[in-house]
């Protein structure tokens, strides 16, 4: 009951009135919340539902490193189907626009990770990079969004492309 009252107060009395500019969330044990009788997948889904906003991006920020997620809290087996060219383009547009608006970055650089090991190894370890992720990055470039082709996630965070980026777009929750 306490959690329910607090979240409603936060939404109704603070965010919708624009009394706060941002919300910082901390990790929570979702199973405890769900075991109490409340349905709770995560903060991102909660705020999306409260504000009636279908297109959302989870952004993790820590000391100059920003990581956005293409999907939210999904079982790993559902991730490939959730990643479409259209959904990636929408995420890239949101990230691009919000980095300009919130951080004053005039031309945000986005490093996009691949989904499969080694970014699919040219189709030998999965075709999502070839069929979905690369076409999305190519279309985003045509829309003047500065994004890389899929980068292998296993070495991404040591890559100069990622270190020089304003944000990394990971394909799923624990990849980011």
Question: In which residue ranges do the predicted regions lie?
Answer:
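Flexible loop/hinge segments that line or gate small-molecule binding clefts
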Residues: 38-76
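Alpha-helix C-terminal capping/helix-to-coil transition sites in glycosyltransferase folds
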Residues: 6, 19, 163-164
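Short Gly/Thr/Asp-enriched flexible loops that form oxyanion-binding sites at enzyme active sites
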Residues: 25-45
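Glycine-rich phosphate/nucleotide-binding loop
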Residues: 132, 136-176
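Single conserved hydrophobic/aromatic residue that forms the stacking wall/gate
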Residues: 1-7, 11
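Glycine-rich phosphate/diphosphate-binding loop of Rossmann-like nucleotide-binding domains
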Residues: 69-150
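Short glycine-rich anion-binding loops that position phosphate/pyrophosphate groups of nucleotides
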Residues: 28-31, 115-118, 173-176
């Amino acid at each position: 009951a306490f959690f329910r009252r607090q979240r409603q107060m936060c939404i109704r009395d603070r965010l919708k009135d624009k009394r706060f500019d941002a919300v910082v969330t901390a990790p929570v044990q979702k199973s405890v919340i769900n075991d109490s009788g409340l349905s709770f997948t995560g903060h991102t889904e909660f705020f999306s539902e409260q504000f009636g906003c279908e297109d959302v991006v989870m952004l993790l920020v820590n000391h100059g490193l920003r990581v956005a997620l293409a999907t939210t809290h999904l079982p790993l087996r559902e991730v490939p189907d959730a990643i479409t060219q259209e959904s990636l383009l929408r995420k890239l547009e949101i990230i691009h626009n919000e980095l300009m608006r919130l951080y004053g970055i005039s031309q945000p650089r986005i490093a996009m990770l691949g989904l499969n090991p080694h970014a699919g190894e040219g189709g030998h370890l999965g075709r999502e990079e070839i069929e979905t992720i690369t076409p999305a990055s190519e279309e985003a470039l045509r829309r003047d969004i500065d994004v890389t082709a899929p980068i292998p996630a296993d070495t991404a965070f040591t890559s100069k492309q990622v270190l020089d980026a304003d944000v990394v777009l990971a394909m799923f929750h624990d990849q980011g």
